[in-house]
C-alpha cells in the first residue's frame, strides 16, 4: 500500500473518530464502513500494522488503533458457531473459511481450540497452540504461541520468538493505552509471565518463568546496580525478584537482569527450535 493511500485512510478515520459519540449503528456512513473494513483487512493481511520499527525506534500508528475502536462501534454482534458451541460477538475468527492448502502453503499450525480474531496477522512458519490472539496483534515468522497464552490487541511479537504457556501479553484497547506491548525478535518469554502497558522486550532476551513487567515495574540490573522502567535491554536474562525498601522493613517486587544471553542460555532454549522443525 502506497503512502498516498495510507494518508487517505488515516484522514477518513481521524475525521470520524472525532465524531464517534454521534455515530449510530442504524445510520452508518458507507464511506466510514468501507474505510474501517479496509483497515481491518489490511491488518489481517499484514499490510498495515499498529507498531513498526522505523530508524531503530518503535512508532505507534494511533490512527489504526482508532480504526479498530470504530470497527467495534459500528459493528453489530452476530451468532457464530463452532461444532455444538455458540458464540455471540462482533469480530469473526481469522481462519474460519481457510482451506487445508492455505495452512500447508504458509506452514501455519493452529491447534484447537486456539482463537485468532480477524484483524490479527499470523506470518508464515508459525505455531499457534490453544491460545488467544486479539485483533490488531502482529505475530511474525518462526514464532510459537504456546498453550493458554494470550496476545492482547495490537501487541507485536517478533520473529523466532517463543511465548510460553500461560503468558499474558497486554493489549491497548481495554484499557486504552498509549503504546502496544512489543516483544522483539529471537526472544523467549517464560511460562506464566505477564508483559503489559507498552513495555518493550528488546531482541535476543530471555525471561524466566513468572516475570511480571508493567510500566511501573522496577527493572534492576544486578551487574550495574541501575534501575530503569519500561523496557528490557537487548540480550538480557531476566528473573523475578525483589528490592528492599530504604528502611529495610519491606521489599518490593522487581524484575532482575542477572546476565546477558550466552551460549549456555541459548542451549537451554534450543529444544524449542528442534520441536518446530519436526512438527512442520
Swiss-Prot record:
<keyword id="KW-0457">Lysine biosynthesis</keyword>
<keyword id="KW-0963">Cytoplasm</keyword>
<dbReference type="GO" id="GO:0009089">
    <property type="term" value="P:lysine biosynthetic process via diaminopimelate"/>
</dbReference>
<dbReference type="InterPro" id="IPR023180">
    <property type="entry name" value="THP_succinylTrfase_dom1"/>
</dbReference>
<keyword id="KW-0220">Diaminopimelate biosynthesis</keyword>
<dbReference type="InterPro" id="IPR001451">
    <property type="entry name" value="Hexapep"/>
</dbReference>
<dbReference type="Pfam" id="PF14602">
    <property type="entry name" value="Hexapep_2"/>
</dbReference>
<dbReference type="InterPro" id="IPR037133">
    <property type="entry name" value="THP_succinylTrfase_N_sf"/>
</dbReference>
<comment type="subunit">
    <text>Homotrimer.</text>
</comment>
<keyword id="KW-0012">Acyltransferase</keyword>
<dbReference type="GO" id="GO:0008666">
    <property type="term" value="F:2,3,4,5-tetrahydropyridine-2,6-dicarboxylate N-succinyltransferase activity"/>
</dbReference>
<keyword id="KW-0028">Amino-acid biosynthesis</keyword>
<dbReference type="InterPro" id="IPR005664">
    <property type="entry name" value="DapD_Trfase_Hexpep_rpt_fam"/>
</dbReference>
<dbReference type="GO" id="GO:0016779">
    <property type="term" value="F:nucleotidyltransferase activity"/>
</dbReference>
<protein>
    <recommendedName>
        <fullName>2,3,4,5-tetrahydropyridine-2,6-dicarboxylate N-succinyltransferase</fullName>
        <ecNumber>2.3.1.117</ecNumber>
    </recommendedName>
</protein>
<keyword id="KW-0808">Transferase</keyword>
<comment type="similarity">
    <text>Belongs to the transferase hexapeptide repeat family.</text>
</comment>
<dbReference type="Pfam" id="PF14805">
    <property type="entry name" value="THDPS_N_2"/>
</dbReference>
<dbReference type="InterPro" id="IPR018357">
    <property type="entry name" value="Hexapep_transf_CS"/>
</dbReference>
<keyword id="KW-0677">Repeat</keyword>
<dbReference type="GO" id="GO:0005737">
    <property type="term" value="C:cytoplasm"/>
</dbReference>
<comment type="pathway">
    <text>Amino-acid biosynthesis; L-lysine biosynthesis via DAP pathway; LL-2,6-diaminopimelate from (S)-tetrahydrodipicolinate (succinylase route): step 1/3.</text>
</comment>
<dbReference type="GO" id="GO:0019877">
    <property type="term" value="P:diaminopimelate biosynthetic process"/>
</dbReference>
<feature type="binding site">
    <location>
        <position position="146"/>
    </location>
    <ligand>
        <name>substrate</name>
    </ligand>
</feature>
<feature type="binding site">
    <location>
        <position position="109"/>
    </location>
    <ligand>
        <name>substrate</name>
    </ligand>
</feature>
<dbReference type="InterPro" id="IPR011004">
    <property type="entry name" value="Trimer_LpxA-like_sf"/>
</dbReference>
Amino acid at each position: 500500500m502506497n503512502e498516498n493511500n495510507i494518508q487517505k485512510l488515516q484522514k477518513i478515520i481521524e475525521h470520524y473518530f472525532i465524531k464517534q459519540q454521534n455515530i449510530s449503528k442504524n445510520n452508518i456512513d458507507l464511506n466510514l464502513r468501507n474505510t474501517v473494513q479496509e483497515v481491518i483487512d489490511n491488518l489481517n493481511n499484514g499490510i498495515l500494522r499498529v507498531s513498526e520499527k522505523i530508524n531503530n525506534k518503535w512508532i505507534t500508528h494511533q490512527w489504526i488503533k482508532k480504526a479498530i475502536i470504530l470497527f467495534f462501534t459500528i459493528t453489530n454482534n452476530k451468532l457464530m458457531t463452532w461444532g455444538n458451541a455458540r458464540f455471540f460477538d462482533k469480530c469473526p475468527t481469522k481462519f474460519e473459511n481457510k482451506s487445508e492448502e492455505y495452512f500447508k502453503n504458509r506452514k501455519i499450525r493452529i491447534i484447537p481450540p486456539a482463537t485468532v480474531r480477524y484483524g490479527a496477522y499470523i506470518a508464515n512458519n508459525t505455531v499457534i497452540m490453544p491460545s488467544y490472539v486479539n485483533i490488531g496483534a502482529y505475530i511474525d515468522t518462526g514464532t510459537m504461541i504456546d498453550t493458554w497464552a494470550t496476545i492482547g490487541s495490537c501487541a507485536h511479537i517478533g520473529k523466532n520468538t517463543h511465548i510460553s504457556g500461560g503468558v499474558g501479553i497486554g493489549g491497548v484497547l481495554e484499557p486504552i493505552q498509549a503504546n502496544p506491548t512489543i516483544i522483539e525478535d529471537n526472544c523467549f518469554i517464560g511460562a506464566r509471565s505477564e508483559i503489559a502497558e507498552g513495555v518493550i522486550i528488546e531482541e535476543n532476551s530471555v525471561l524466566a518463568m513468572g516475570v511480571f513487567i508493567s510500566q511501573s515495574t522496577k527493572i534492576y540490573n544486578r551487574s550495574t546496580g541501575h534501575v530503569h522502567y519500561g523496557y528490557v535491554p537487548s540480550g538480557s536474562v531476566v528473573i523475578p525478584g525483589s528490592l528492599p525498601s530504604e528502611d529495610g522493613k519491606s521489599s518490593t517486587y522487581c524484575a532482575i537482569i542477572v546476565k546477558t544471553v550466552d551460549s549456555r542460555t541459548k542451549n537451554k532454549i534450543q529444544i524449542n527450535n528442534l520441536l518446530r522443525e519436526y512438527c512442520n
